[in-house]
Each structure stands twice: as structure tokens, then as C-alpha cells.
Amino acid sequence: MEIRQAKFIKGIIGTDDILKSKREQIAFIGRSNVGKSTLINNLTGNKGLVKTSGQPGKTKQINFFSAILTNTSADDTTKRNKEVYLVDLPGYGYAKIPQSQREKMRKMILWYFISGEAKIKKVVLIIDAKAGLKEFDLEMIDVLKEYGPQYGYDFVIAANKIDKLNQKQTHKNLNKIKEQLGENIPVIPISAKTGKGRNKLLEWMEK
């Protein structure tokens, strides 16, 4: 599968007409500085799609990008292309922004996943493979486990930045992450920088 023709549509901070669209949504969520923007750019093949910033916590809205998922293995050409929204949620957990702003973004993120307004199909929760799961990651996982079945969406843990770890460290850290999860939640090791693991993540998104 490939993601093609991705382009920015709009940013929202709450209820919006775009949520009434029948297009399914693939959401990307993660702490500030885990490489979320770089990963989305890598998956879409468009390095300038999501603006990366040296200032964590800069994104304060939920950004929608239209895209076409192309299943190159489909025999029926009518089933090859599917229009979706890629949804880039604000990075969370950055300590240097005011507490009030952090809490506002937290509530906006939770609203997106639990309100039932968004037609979410898949959620990619991006973490830093070296840092492992942090407090808000675990809170998000609990939310996704509770509301995913209710609203019909699946989620995966994308353990990013494995290019910064050697093979032994990668194996050790992934095992620790899986132990923390304690159940059958898929974990895909990736590198948004080098593209390693990209195809596995795309395969999961296609299911």
C-alpha cells in the first residue's frame, strides 16, 4: 500500500463540519519530539507536508490532510484507491509550555477520541523507542482500549527512532515496552528518519 496525493485541508480545535464527512480517519498521536511529523511525511512521501518545528508544543490544533490510500495488489481497480483523512493531533507532554495550555491540548486530544464525532478507523500512537512508554502514553492507551471497540477503531504502537539504537538495545527496549503493555497490542519498530519499518506500518494501516 502507498499513501498518495496528501495535502493539508484545515485545522480544528473542536466540533467542525469536516467531522461530518464519511471519509475514514487515520489518526497520529504522540508526545512532543517523538518524530510524529517526520513519520507522517515519510509515510506520504512528502517531506514538506507536515511542517516540522524545533519548538515542541507548537501545534495547537488538530490538522486534517486528505490522502488516497492505494492498494497496488488489488485486482479490481475500483478497490485500489480509497480517500481518507490523515489526522495529526498536537504533541503532548512538553513541560516548557504553560500548564493551562498543556491541559487545554490534553482535553482537545481526549475529546477527539472519546466524543464519537470523528470517523476514526486507525490510530498510530508514536513513542520514542529509547525513552519507552511515559505517563500520558499509558493514559492514551487506556483511552484507546476503552473507546476503540465502542467506535470501531484499532490502534498500534509505533516505536520510533530505532535508528538511534543498536540491535541489542532495540530488542531490550521493545521487550520492555511489550511487558509494560501487558497484552496483545501490536508494536511496530520504525525509523521515520531512515524509513525502516515503514512498509510494516503501511500494511497494518491497510488491514
Explain the meaning of each model-derived region:
Residues 1-94:
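Conserved G1/Walker A P-loop phosphate-binding module
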Residues 3-16, 164-207:
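Canonical P-loop GTPase G-domain recognition
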Residues 43-47, 113, 205:
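Hydrophobic aliphatic residues
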Residues 59, 102-106, 110, 134, ...:
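Amphipathic alpha-helical transducer elements in NTP-driven molecular machines
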Residues 88, 160, 191:
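Active-site glycine-centered loops adjacent to acidic/histidine catalytic or metal-binding residues
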Residues 92-102, 163-166:
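Flexible beta-alpha connector loops of hexameric P-loop NTPases
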Residues 107-185:
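Conserved C-terminal guanine-recognition region of P-loop GTPase G domains, centered on the G4
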